[in-house]
């Protein structure tokens, strides 16, 4: 995806950062539906494309330790904040900026997941059932990175 964006995005730097945030988000919410068909592009004219809005994110409380799509082509499929941090250069993001993106995303998720569920009518026992999708060892690592 990054290679496509390098060649065809009208704003590759912004798209790299957005894709990296989505990778972090996928890890931190235990998204079980992270395959390549769930990344789209919108045509903006003159042979240029932009990353589409995010779609089809499915938090999974069972915390599958593997991603459907490897972080780097030919790489491990581990659901790992540390691997995401190691991959930041591929997204042309400096390590210090990647760490801040990881921490900020983790804070936003850990501070807001209960309210987000409440807003869509999920509360009580069902919300507690989803807690492992949002509060995990990867969340702890992300907050401390």
Language model segments and positions:
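Anionic ligand-binding catalytic core segments
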Residues: 1-36, 40-145
């Amino acid at each position: 995806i990054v290679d496509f964006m390098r060649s065809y995005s009208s704003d590759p730097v912004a798209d790299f950062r957005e894709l990296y945030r989505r990778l972090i988000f996928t890890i931190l919410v235990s998204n079980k539906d992270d395959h390549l068909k769930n990344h789209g592009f919108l045509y903006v004219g003159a042979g240029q494309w932009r990353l589409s809005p995010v779609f089809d994110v499915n938090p999974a409380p069972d915390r599958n330790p593997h991603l459907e799509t490897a972080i780097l082509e030919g790489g491990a499929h581990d659901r790992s904040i540390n691997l995401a941090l190691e991959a930041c250069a591929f997204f042309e993001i400096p390590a210090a900026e990647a760490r801040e993106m990881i921490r900020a995303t983790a804070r936003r998720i850990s501070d807001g997941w209960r309210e987000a569920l409440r807003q869509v009518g999920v509360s009580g026992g069902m919300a507690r059932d989803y807690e492992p999708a949002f509060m995990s060892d990867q969340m702890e690592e992300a907050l401390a990175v």
